[in-house]
Amino acid sequence: MLSAIVRSSVAALATLLLSGLGSAGGIHEVHMSNDQSVQAQEQATRVVIDRFNDAFNRHDADALAALLTEDTVFEDTSPQPDGKRIEGKAAVVEFWRGWFTRNADAHFDAEDIIVSGSRATVLWVYRKMRNGQPWHLRGVDVFTVREGKVAAKFAYVKG
C-alpha cells in the first residue's frame, strides 16, 4: 500500500515537473519573483524612511509634507500616557512646523532601521540641549509606507 502511495506521489511530481512548472517560468521562478518583489518593496520603503529622517533633521516641514499621504496619521509620544493622535497631512505638517520652532536644536540619530515590506521600525536617539546641558531620549518609530509616502508614524519613548 505504501509503495503505491509513493509511486503515485512520484508520478504526480514528475507530471508537475514535465508540465513546465518546474522549469523557466515555473515554481522556482515565481518564488524568485516574489522574493525580488518583496526586496524591491523593502528598498523603496527604506528610501522613504531615509528621506523622511533627512527632512526631519533639516527641520524641513515642506520636504516632510511631500513625503506624507493625504490621510497620514501621526501619534506623538506626549502627552503621557498615550500620546496625541494627529490625522491628515495638513494637521501633521502644522504640528511639525510648530515642533521645529520649539526645538530648533533637536536632532534624531537613527541607531537602527528594520524594514519589512511596507513597514519600518526606527530605533532612535533624540538629542538637544536642555537647561544648557546636552540631553537625550531613546525611542522607536513605527512607520507604514503606502505608494511611496508615509501613511502612518507612531512614536514611542523610553522612560
Question: Residue ranges of each PLM-predicted region?
Answer:
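Short, low-complexity N-terminal intrinsically disordered segments enriched in polar/charged residues
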Residues: L2, S23-A66, E70
